[in-house]
Each structure stands twice: as C-alpha cells, then as structure tokens.
Amino acid sequence: MPHERVPDWPTDRWQMWLGKGRHFLAFPVRAGKLINYVGFVPTDEEMKESWTAPGNPEVLRQAFVGWDPRIHQLLGEVQVTFRWALYDREPLPVWTKQRLGLLGDAAHPMLPHLGQGANQSIEDGIALATILARANRATAPSALLAYERLRRERVAQVQRGARENGLRYDSAYSDLGVRDAEITAHATFRKRLYDHDVVPDAQAAAAALM
C-alpha cells in the first residue's frame, strides 16, 4: 500500500510478528514509497495455485484481532488484498534429461520463508548460461548435467531451510527459548546464503567440460 496511508510507518526496516499458527510481515519497497505486507494464516480450504486470487480485507483483519495495534493500523488502511496457498514440495531428484533441463520454480518450488525463490532462479540462470556458453549441440546433455550437479544440492538446502524457517515462525514450535536461539543462529546460514557467488563455480564446471 502507499506509504502515505500510514505515514508514520518506518521505512528503514522490515518487521515480523510471530504467533500461534500464524505470523505477519511488513516491509518497505520502492525506496519506501510502498509498504508490502503479508499475513500467513492456516486454512483447511483447498485453493488453486494463483498469484492473483482476490482476498477479503476484512477476513485478513479478523485473522489478526488482538495482535499488535500497529498491525491493526496497517490493516485498517487495506482496501484490496490477494491470497495464495503455500504448498510445500520435496526437492526433485532429477532436473535434466538429455537436452531438456529445468530451472527456477520448475526445478525447485519453495516456500517464501527465506525470500529466495527469485534469487535462486537468477543463480540458476547465471549458472546455466555460463556452462552452456562452453557447450555445443553434441555436449549439451553433459553441460545440462553439470549444471544440475552444480545447483541441485545447494537449492535443496535452501528449500529445506525455507521450510524449517516457516516452522520457527509458529510460536507453537517446540520450546520458544530454543526457537529464538535458532532464529538468532540462523544469521550464519543467511550470510552464507547471501554471500554465495555462483559465477566462479559455474566457470569451473564449464571448464571441466572442455
């Protein structure tokens, strides 16, 4: 939503509220001109996978009744919402076959709890382009296999990490002291995740094809 609707909302940080079975996230985008917000709530309703299914702002507000007044302030300004279901899938055992290869969500659909779906797709694209630049029609299957070997385990770790992070965001998760310690320790995993440079590894994989 436009920041002008909630002018006192901070634009220098993201904020998350954790509760039993649900959590709420809000953060600035477009240099603070907009505030993006997401409410995660459980449901038994079967939903189609869609990014454009309309939601009901009042239903969203009711899902967080009794929570922090800042959430009520934000949701009080909501006029339009969208909703989508989160489906968890196990990492695929195979990404490629002969001259056919998968990347991005087709290869590794993941939960959003690390914010890594698009990032990992970009890494895929860089790795694939770097390796295929050294390939020809005859060596394409080997190049695709090299791409899969380079990327599959790293992305599987991210998929599993997103799942585990989502569980931590539920206050019913184990002992809260243990949960909070895990969230703090998770900074090390995030640094390793964010600092990764796929280019040198992809170049080495490409050179090995020669």
Where are the regions that the model predicts?
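C-terminal domain-closing interface element
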Residues: 168-189
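Conserved FAD-binding catalytic core of PHBH/FMO-like flavoproteins
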Residues: 1-79
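A basic- and aromatic-enriched beta-loop-alpha substructure that forms the phosphate/nucleotide-
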Residues: 160, 175, 209
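Short aromatic-enriched loop/helix-cap "lid" or pocket-rim segments at secondary-structure transitions
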Residues: 11, 50, 158-160, 170
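Solvent-exposed, flexible loop/coil residues
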Residues: 21-22, 33, 45, 55, ...
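C-terminal auxiliary extensions adjacent to catalytic cores
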Residues: 183-210
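Conserved mid-domain beta->alpha element of the FAD-binding
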Residues: 26, 57-60, 80-168
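Residue-level signal for pocket-adjacent positions within structured domains
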Residues: 1-4, 46, 81, 87-90, ...
